């Protein structure tokens, strides 16, 4: 076990896109899994959630599992930092992962989903100052 303070741990998710044969490999180190909108049936899946390991620097012997998934035309994947799902409003409520899932499930292309999420977070927090950085990456197979 590391002697680092809890706030010093780092989580991450790595998504490697393999254009041929249209697959992604996901490795998760204690991070929120990608929110993936499957275009074939409009379902939300979160690959890498079961395979998530500990944040880095907690256990120097930690071995991380990868998961490989096929990405179909029209599929959209949302990756985000905890500053997005943990964004707080004036009532001390978190934006939450459920909102991210719901807003992604509403569909659209990568730009539409990006715009929807950014607008929703900005509206939710209103004039409450952010306590953490926020990053959002939305990718789509065309």
For every predicted segment, state its role.
Residues 1-142:
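Conserved subregion of the PPM/PP2C metallophosphatase catalytic domain
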């Amino acid at each position: 076990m590391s002697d680092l303070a809890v706030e010093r741990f780092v989580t991450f998710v790595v998504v490697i896109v393999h254009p041929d044969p249209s697959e992604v490999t996901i490795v998760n180190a204690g991070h929120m899994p990608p929110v993936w909108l499957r275009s074939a049936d409009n379902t939300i899946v979160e690959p890498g959630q079961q395979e998530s390991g500990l944040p880095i620097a907690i256990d120097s012997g930690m071995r991380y599992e990868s998961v490989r998934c096929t990405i179909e035309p029209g599929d959209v994947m949302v990756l985000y930092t905890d500053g997005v799902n943990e964004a707080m409003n004036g009532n001390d409520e978190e934006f939450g992962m459920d909102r991210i899932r719901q807003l992604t499930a509403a569909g659209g292309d990568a730009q539409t989903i990006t715009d929807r999420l950014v607008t929703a977070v900005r509206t939710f927090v209103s004039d409450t100052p952010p306590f953490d950085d926020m990053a959002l990456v939305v990718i789509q197979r065309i």
